[in-house]
């Protein structure tokens, strides 16, 4: 059996070994997946696996086991590959049956395309990017817990990347790798009766070099501007229907960075006669779907763990499965909440009411949907933010320090009129072009409306404002497929910072009422941030993630009491409490309970929620009287 680290350094050896033992039994594929799942369960075995998120690609050994924390940005068409093929060995004049799974190119030798042992299989390709807006503290924490032993690969270095697809003459002296694998897979698929026209991998290296891939700029299609990190083509072999667009995953797979992959597009163009479906691909589609492996490596998925969150300070498994951990955290919850409330009060210049609602906003979560109505969302409009000051920038930095993923959108006229927010389908390249609103669940989106100046919104700006409004109201983004729009549900925490009431809808408006007036606002806000030591920040990070993940119920007794209370309030003043007001009050009560670590609503919690909401409404009405013209 493989030694301790053989399954990390040489996973293909494990795969080939299990394939050889199978004697053509179809169960061998399940055994491969189970083998690696069991290995990753041992102690902290997952920390031994190098991560593409924090290890440079040229430090990773080709065909080794790696992991990648990512979001599914796009899903390409299914493709065929040779799952099993037979090789002719001219030296020994013998034949060997080989496994083609988890590989992009065949081994050296001659493939017998007429062999009855050939099996054509199908796989799906996901285009995956790092989780958009992931905070630096998250990346550093994940990297800090890694126990992977990584040394620079001698067979795959940056110079080698460039040479391999530009001017590498050594390719002429290397063994001739099979160029006709696509033709063999095509004829094999025909013999198996697969006539559905699907894109089929050529999977053949070219001995002629081309610099087209390096001279043309490659758009890695990150949703957020300025993002960095690796993008991957993840090859999925089983249960690909269980994955959805925008899912957060931690993928464990076999890294494929063969230089041959960098010229597949050129080879396809030259060999399009071998497969009619190849000729149907445009040059742009080939460029997008077969980028240089040195820039977009391939990752053959063995196992993928859906991520409920990307907070490295919490267990990756659901909290209900970690009773001891949850009990420990809940024991400290009250004190941590009080400290966080004080911290937010200082950041909000002495406004403790706004600090309360900021906590409720940050732990809000769409926990269910009733028809089209998302339940649990709590978009906060923090009005009264000073213009031409560093306040909103510092407020976002504070949030960025506490949540795993976030993004600040400056709502300047230029950004509104030029930024692509809604993803759209590019039919020429056959890919989904990302937009700012293609975000993973539980991302904090900070909309800075104080940057919006007077001017005219063009058609793009109007579409962007509409998209933001739909995101806030319905927690959905309508992706643009040219001839139609397709709804994609989301779960995004939206905070709007504005001077007056926001032009966008919100679930709750709190007008900032500062009781502090520091002579130098920037110095004051910086000092408040610096005063928080890392251990204290970690407590806040755990608190917010745990409170968000807690289950919540309302007993029949409390439900009846709330209904009676609602009837009484309507009797006194029918205009004082609408059904919408009651819904918001119930959301506040839910979040207030969870913020105190209580997973059910009590009478005391209901009364506190009513008091908190009464204070907020009173302040909002006072502000309307002051402004006069504010809606």
UniProtKB/Swiss-Prot annotation:
Signal peptide: none
Keywords: Cell cycle, Cell division, DNA replication, Mitosis, Nucleus
A Pfam family it matches: MCM_bind
Subcellular location: Nucleus
Biased composition regions of type Low complexity, renumbered to the chain: 206-217
Region called Disordered, residue ranges: 148-218
A GO MF label: chromatin binding
Source organism, top-level taxon: Eukaryota
Cellular component annotations (GO), alphabetically ordered: nucleus
Amino acid composition bias (Polar residues), ranges on this chain: 148-157, 173-192
One GO process term, biological-process aspect: DNA-templated DNA replication
Bias kind Basic and acidic residues: ranges: 193-202
Function text: Associated component of the mcm complex that acts as a regulator of DNA replication. Binds to the MCM complex during late S phase and promotes the disassembly of the mcm complex from chromatin, thereby acting as a key regulator of pre-replication complex (pre-RC) unloading from replicated DNA. Can dissociate the mcm complex without addition of ATP; probably acts by destabilizing interactions of each individual subunits of the mcm complex. Required for sister chromatid cohesion.
Protein family (similarity comment): Belongs to the MCMBP family.
Quaternary assembly: Interacts with the mcm complex: associates with the mcm3-7 complex which lacks mcm2, while it does not interact with the mcm complex when mcm2 is present (mcm2-7 complex).
Protein name (Swiss-Prot/TrEMBL): Mini-chromosome maintenance complex-binding protein
């Amino acid at each position: 059996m493989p030694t301790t680290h053989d399954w990390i350094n040489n996973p293909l050896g494990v795969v080939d070994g299990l394939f050889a033992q199978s004697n053509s039994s179809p169960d061998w594929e399940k055994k491969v997946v189970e083998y690696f799942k069991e290995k990753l369960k041992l102690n902290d075995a997952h920390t031994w696996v190098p991560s593409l998120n924090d290890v440079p690609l040229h430090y990773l050994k080709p065909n080794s086991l790696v992991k990648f924390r990512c979001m599914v940005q796009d899903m390409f068409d299914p493709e065929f590959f040779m799952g099993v093929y037979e090789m002719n060995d001219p030296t020994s004049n013998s034949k060997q049956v080989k496994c083609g799974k988890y590989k992009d190119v065949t081994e050296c030798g001659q493939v017998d395309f007429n062999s009855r042992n050939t099996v054509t299989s199908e796989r799906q390709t996901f285009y995956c990017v790092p989780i958009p807006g992931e905070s630096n503290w998250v990346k550093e924490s994940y990297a800090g817990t890694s126990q992977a032993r990584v040394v620079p690969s001698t067979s795959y270095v940056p110079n080698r990347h460039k040479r391999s697809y530009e001017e590498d003459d050594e390719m002429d002296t290397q063994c001739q790798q099979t160029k006709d694998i696509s033709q063999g897979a095509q004829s094999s698929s025909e013999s198996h009766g697969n006539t559905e026209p699907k894109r089929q991998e050529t999977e053949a290296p070219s001995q002629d070099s081309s610099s087209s891939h390096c001279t043309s700029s490659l758009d890695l299609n990150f949703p957020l501007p300025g993002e960095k990190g690796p993008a991957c083509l993840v090859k999925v072999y089983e249960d690909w229907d269980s994955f959805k667009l925008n899912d957060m995953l931690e993928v464990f797979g076999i890294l494929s960075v063969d230089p041959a992959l960098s010229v597949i597009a050129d080879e396809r163009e030259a060999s399009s006669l071998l497969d009619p479906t190849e000729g149907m691909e445009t040059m742009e589609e080939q460029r997008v779907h077969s980028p240089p492996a040195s820039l977009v490596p391939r990752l053959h998925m063995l196992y993928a763990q859906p991520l409920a969150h990307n907070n490295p300070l919490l267990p990756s498994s659901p909290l209900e499965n970690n009773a001891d951990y949850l009990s420990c955290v809940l024991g400290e919850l009250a004190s941590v909440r009080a400290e966080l409330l004080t911290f937010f009060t200082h950041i909000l210049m002495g406004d403790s009411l706004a600090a309360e609602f900021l906590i409720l906003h940050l732990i809000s979560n769409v926990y269910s949907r009733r028809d089209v109505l998302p339940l649990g969302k709590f978009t906060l409009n923090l009005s009264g933010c000073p213009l031409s000051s560093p306040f909103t920038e510092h407020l976002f930095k504070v949030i960025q320090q506490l949540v795993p993923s976030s993004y600040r959108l400056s709502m300047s006229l230029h950004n509104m009129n030029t930024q692509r927010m809604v993803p759209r389908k590019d039919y020429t390249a056959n890919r989904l072009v990302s937009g700012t609103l293609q975000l993973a669940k539980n991302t904090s989106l900070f909309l800075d409306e104080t940057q919006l100046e007077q001017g005219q919104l063009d058609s793009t700006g109007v579409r962007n404002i509409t998209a933001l409004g739909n995101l806030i109201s319905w927690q959905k983004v309508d992706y643009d497929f040219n001839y139609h729009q397709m709804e994609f549900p989301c779960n995004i925490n939206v905070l709007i910072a504005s001077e007056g009431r926001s032009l966008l809808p919100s679930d709750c408006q709190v007008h900032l009422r500062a009781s502090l007036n520091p002579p130098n606002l920037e110095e004051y806000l910086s000092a408040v941030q610096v005063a928080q030591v890392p251990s204290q920040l970690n407590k806040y990070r755990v608190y917010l993630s745990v409170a968000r993940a807690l289950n919540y119920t309302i007993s029949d007794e409390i439900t009846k009491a709330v209904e009676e209370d609602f009837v009484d309030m309507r009797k006194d003043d029918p205009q004082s409490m609408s059904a919408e007001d009651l819904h918001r009050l119930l959301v506040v009560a839910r979040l207030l309970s969870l913020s105190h670590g209580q997973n059910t609503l009590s009478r005391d919690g209901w009364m506190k929620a009513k008091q908190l909401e009464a204070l907020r409404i009173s302040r909002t009405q006072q502000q309307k009287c002051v402004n006069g013209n504010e809606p």
